[in-house]
């Protein structure tokens, strides 16, 4: 269970219109909306949480239900059984969540590490995903089962264990924001979420990052897919998003190139929630031709 410090941080970032729901092993935030459109499910990145999506949830159209999960091992969501999970393990949890909510189909957004999960769900369970958005995509490192994590990935959980959540977040968090000294609220939101990271959930997510192969799943996509990234992202730079957009099969292409969101770094939905919401509302309301 999360500590009281985590709970208080979460409460500060929640809206009265958003409900916290424990759905099986997953802790989620739900902003209820009309039932005549598929809900939108939001999957966060490795250093983030469901409550990080609050500004975006406020800015998105109220014409649909919006759900933001805490990934397995984050907040009050139960960690996965394997200490070295792969993307299929996380994708299975998404499908269990959809089944528990009796949702035959959703629109799906993944941010950063969440793009690995979102793309795998859409590629392997295409009937469950109507439209997809990959925001600040990460390619993953593609290590084979049993291989050691790349040093840069292995260092993450080790550093968390050594420093503790607060110091870890203070060190790593500002890099996610473009010109953090001028975006105090966004930077503090990043740090607040990152300070709640715990083991084993963060270490399991590092294994997902190490083993992920985003382009393999992107090649299998059939649903209309948006790829977008902050123009100033130094964590997953725009060239990565361009590669992802170029790898989409013709039937998944909605725009000829990745969309660049100007003036934003990696934490794009916290830096410019209104701009990101407008982009997503257009994408998820379009008819694919």
Give the location of each predicted region.
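Alpha/beta-hydrolase fold catalytic core
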Residues: 1-40, 61-64, 103-104, 257, ...
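Conserved HGGG/HGGXW glycine-rich cap/lid loop of the alpha/beta-hydrolase fold
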Residues: 24-79
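Conserved acidic catalytic loop of the alpha/beta-hydrolase fold
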Residues: 89-106
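Flexible "cap/lid" loop of the alpha/beta hydrolase fold
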Residues: 119, 123-124, 129-162
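Conserved alpha/beta-hydrolase catalytic His-Asp/Glu region
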Residues: 144-149, 161-219
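Short beta-strand/loop motif that positions the catalytic acidic residue
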Residues: 221, 227-229, 233
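Catalytic histidine neighborhood in serine/cysteine hydrolases
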Residues: 242, 246-266
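Catalytic histidine-centered segment of alpha/beta-hydrolase-like enzymes
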Residues: 264-273, 277
